[in-house]
Amino acid sequence: MDKRHNPSRRIIAPHGSKLSCKSWTTEAPMRMLMNNLHPDVAERPEDLVVYGGIGRAARDWECYDKIIEVLQRLEEDETLLVQSGKPVGVFKTHNNAPRVIIANSNLVPHWANWEHFNELDKKGLAMYGQMTAGSWIYIGSQGIVQGTYETFVAMAKQHFGGSSAGKWILTGGLGGMGGAQPLAGTMAGYSVLTCEVDETRIDFRLRTRYVDKKATSLDEALAMIDEANKSGKPVSVGLLANAADVFAELVERGITPDVVTDQTSAHDPLNGYLPQGWSLEQAADMRKKDEAAVVKAAKQSMAVQVKAMLALQAAGAATTDYGNNIRQMAFEEGVENAFDFPGFVPAYVRPLFCEGIGPFRWAALSGDPEDIYKTDAKVKELIPDNPHLHNWLDMARERIAFQGLPSRICWVGLKDRARLALAFNEMVKNGELSAPVVIGRDHLDSGSVASPNRETESMLDGSDAVSDWPLMNALLNTASGATWVSLHHGGGVGMGFSQHSGVVIVADGTDDAAARLGRVLWNDPATGVMRHADAGYDIAKNCAKEQGLDLPMLEK
């Protein structure tokens, strides 16, 4: 019997201002862990899977229950240690220390591969935490919508003279991450055709308003895209089909999308990518019988898809890897030029990272959407001269359905994160907000990740694989007083290809919280500016000087 599977469990985080733990600094991680497993948030909550193939919130249900139990008794001067989803110790620390420290999926580099991890996983000795699954700050697909939106806007500026009108995107994957693409694309003015092999995922995205329409044939989907482009009203279509099949067929037909990318769970060939010609049931059965055969077949299909992406690029499509390591998988399968199209970070996002700009997010522990709308207004008030940001907040309110606890994401940088956090804390203190908020981010941020095929691809100084930076980020956030800190391996791109850290902090209206917020929300993005300045980026060097960062080796 799999201790991770229990279809009878239905987890909903408490709402309101009544505590079930001893303080908000322990109530917050409890509610956010539970929120990760909300049926409208998680991909397979009955299996503790939040998103990204097998990205889990806890190792098994026994561990989940014990984590909740410990958080409810944890004192304000104690720290819970969670090792790959298992609560392993409680230690006396102090009230400015994190209440929870998490380490997920970390392996000694020589053994940092899927084969070794899967053996440990089968024995119940490890858990894949992805990025925000095992660090308890996943907020549904909204968590990646703005980053995807910013990328698509940047692509329009770079390739289409700033206008996406009449343009369409071809992509794959409607899971927890990929599900953001159709909404982000239409918000940026494109029509979007997304291939997905699991019909329940298409239906989930329809229900949560991330996808507009469903199609069961390529002809039907293309007709929907064509009609939308003629009418000038962008549409997103979820096509029930294998991405490798569709991408290759478009090449054969001579049909070239304007933008091509992919966000299937290609990072995990065993659990995350359905081989061509296979049914979901067949794949599930084969995983029990012959894992190596599944991996081989999946990677062969990825090779087909990447070859098609290269052909579409040659035909004129703006083509980018959206961070799922599909190029690496195809390269290992013999596609020698798999890396001829760039990753999205070096191509479109890195200038933002140089200024510490990244996916700042917060959630209302009250469960009241009004608390988010009030914080939206506060962001506009404090950052009045950023129409692009204001437009994002307006679109987010209008078009993004909350999943679980109401939350918001907006990309802001070093000079703004601490200001916003302190303002939110003041709103809790004076009663404008009905309960505290938690503030966190994705691990995909400027100073918190080493991932040579994604966030740190093609660094100016060649330091792509240096992972000291996320380790220092986690240690500094711990020293600065974050409420919980996490250090993971393998998120986004799979085992052996990334190390990254997460941070979450509670704004509970107290003066102690204000001091912690000021430190954490300055230091955390500052490490991103530091990392990019150290790599030689002029934007980061200038930002460091403007913001007065003390970087001893930076020329004054």
From Swiss-Prot:
> Cellular location of this protein?
Cytoplasm
**What enzyme category does the UniProt record give?**
lyase
What's the main place this protein lives? Answer: cytoplasm
Superkingdom field: Bacteria
- Under which pathway is this protein filed? Amino-acid degradation; L-histidine degradation into L-glutamate; N-formimidoyl-L-glutamate from L-histidine: step 2/3
Record's catalysed reaction(s): 4-imidazolone-5-propanoate = trans-urocanate + H2O
- What is the name listed in the Swiss-Prot or TrEMBL entry for this protein? Urocanate hydratase
Q: Name one GO cellular component term.
A: cytoplasm
Which GO terms label this protein's molecular function in UniProt?
urocanate hydratase activity
